[in-house]
Amino acid sequence: MKIMRKNHPLLKIVNHSFIDLPTPSNISSWWNFGSLLGICLMIQILTGLFLAMHYTSDTTTAFSSVAHICRDVNYGWLIRYLHANGASMFFICLFIHVGRGIYYGSYTLSETWNIGIILFLTTMATAFVGYVLPWGQMSFWGATVITNLLSAIPYIGSTLVEWIWGGFSVDKATLTRFFAFHFILPFIITALVLVHLLFLHETGSNNPSGLNSDSDKIPFHPYYTFKDLLGILLLLMALMILALFFPDILGDPDNYTPANPLNTPAHIKPEWYFLFAYAILRSIPNKLGGVLALILSILILATFPLLNTSKQHGLIYRPITQTIYWIFIANLLVLTWIGGQPVEYPFTMIGQIASITYFGIIIILMPISNTIENNIIKL
């Protein structure tokens, strides 16, 4: 078997990626989240496949087909709640994965980092079109509000919105194409994950110390397969607790009301994992400015390799930047909170301050702290 896995054309790829892969001996549990994201993706594809067997992408029957899945299909309620809460677990792992990348300076592996940003955007697009499918009130109005943002694009905006809608409003054509997008995008994500891993294995993994670890590497299996297994068990336990005991805690009660174009919900808001970006969007009074800020809130991650001037790798020995990093995380939590609040004083003002802080930390404070720390090293 040993010779086969090293010589067989297909098994050789698996062997070099997951078994004999030379891995730094000191990587911590923060490196577990890559494999957890892979597990989340597998759970989402499998549960989504079974849901797609019973779902109908028609405005008249979409809502009742979801109710039918929960009531009449064997374990349909479990599959539905695993899929809905699995998305939340996916984004929790994704945020931690990106946060770890920033903290330990993984953005210096620029190809891997940039593919990661594309993956992040694709996952957000998948989650958005998926949220529209149950055709509840928040699904309908979320789709209307977010797709309408494209009308802010000069000259082609209105035409583009109607082209995406497939008509003059969010209707049957929109739901059908969103279902098609939601079905195909996870497979595109899977392909991008393979490219992400390809670039990662080209350079090798980063490690907590930020030093070159070529002289001290161990095989991925059995050391990290068992370490990852613990993380996977904890993830599955958390997901099952969510799906079985608190299935609706992260959802919106408005989505249990069928979509009604004549009745607008009091507060239109997306799922919790989009709230930080939604808060940034709302904090700018101008429509086009808001859309640009929304896009930049994710694309700004691509500036990390460009703005990094530090002579040290990662933040482990950099107390000034470490402090700024944790302020950034706290600010992100404030933005998430503000995104779920109504558009009124003092929430609008807090949102504007937090949005300025979000961009200010990345573009101004982190490069300044890099320079200060470089000068301290010279002393």
Swiss-Prot record:
Functional note: Component of the ubiquinol-cytochrome c reductase complex (complex III or cytochrome b-c1 complex) that is part of the mitochondrial respiratory chain. The b-c1 complex mediates electron transfer from ubiquinol to cytochrome c. Contributes to the generation of a proton gradient across the mitochondrial membrane that is then used for ATP synthesis.
Question: What is this protein's name?
Answer: Cytochrome b
Could you say which cofactors this protein requires? Answer: heme b
Can you supply a Gene Ontology BP term from the record? mitochondrial electron transport, ubiquinol to cytochrome c
Where, in this chain's numbering, is a ubiquinone bound?
A: H201
Q: How does it assemble?
A: The cytochrome bc1 complex contains 11 subunits: 3 respiratory subunits (MT-CYB, CYC1 and UQCRFS1), 2 core proteins (UQCRC1 and UQCRC2) and 6 low-molecular weight proteins (UQCRH/QCR6, UQCRB/QCR7, UQCRQ/QCR8, UQCR10/QCR9, UQCR11/QCR10 and a cleavage product of UQCRFS1). This cytochrome bc1 complex then forms a dimer.
Keyword rRNA-binding in the entry? The reply is no
Any idea which positions bind heme b b562? H83, H182
Q: Cite the effect that the entry attributes to G360V.
A: In strain: Isolate UP22
What GO cellular component term, any one, is given?
respiratory chain complex III
* Species annotation: Necromys temchuki (Temchuk's bolo mouse)
Q: What else is known?
A: Heme 1 (or BL or b562) is low-potential and absorbs at about 562 nm, and heme 2 (or BH or b566) is high-potential and absorbs at about 566 nm.
- Pfam families on file: Cytochrom_B_C (PF00032), Cytochrome_B (PF00033)
The UniProt entry lists membrane topology as: Multi-pass membrane protein
Q: Where are the transmembrane segments?
A: 33-53, 77-98, 113-133, 178-198, 226-246, 288-308, 320-340, 347-367
Q: Which family does it belong to?
A: Belongs to the cytochrome b family.
Residues noted as binding heme b b566 in the record, renumbered to the chain: H97, H196
Cofactor annotation remark: Binds 2 heme b groups non-covalently.
